[in-house]
Amino acid sequence: MTLIKNEDFKFYIQIPNFISDNKCDELIKDISENEVMLKGGVRVDDEQNLGVNEKFRKTSEWYLCEQPYTNQRPDKPNKDWKPLQEKIFSMAKLINMKSFKFDIQECDNELKLIKYKNTNFYTWHTDMNSGSSSLRKLTAIVQLTDPSEYEGGELQFALQDHDMNWYEVPKEKGSITFFPTFLSHRV
């Protein structure tokens, strides 16, 4: 086995105007009218507690890809979101090849819209865990709302600059941000 160095590693890559402003607005409207909204949060799945723990995460979410049915999400969306999924996955492959160089064989079906209302949040976390999410290597986030329409909602990484400030991703409607799934972050 030959190890490959990554001389140009960045902890995130952001592409502006990945989706047009009009398309962002259409997506939000279309998804909220056609898909089943779920209460987002850290899942509690033991015999005593089944549901959502809002101490760590409080959001609304819509799943946009077919997945195995669980009692916490639908198995099939009402519309076909494959074109959006393919656009994101194609860009993920390109970004990975040029910047991250992870050994990625395929993408999982975790395409979803997450809405953060005024008091919503997601504390420090990574996007990998045991089970199927342990295979994840790259996370993508698309900013669908103009940042002038809300306060807060910063995507921050658990990395600090020279002044000990958390690194924040610029908020720009239509942009997509890729980062390693193991990188701790919060909203």
What are these regions (language model features)?
Residues 75-187:
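Catalytic core of non-heme Fe(II) oxygenases with the double-stranded beta-helix
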Residues 2-101:
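Non-heme Fe(II)/2-oxoglutarate
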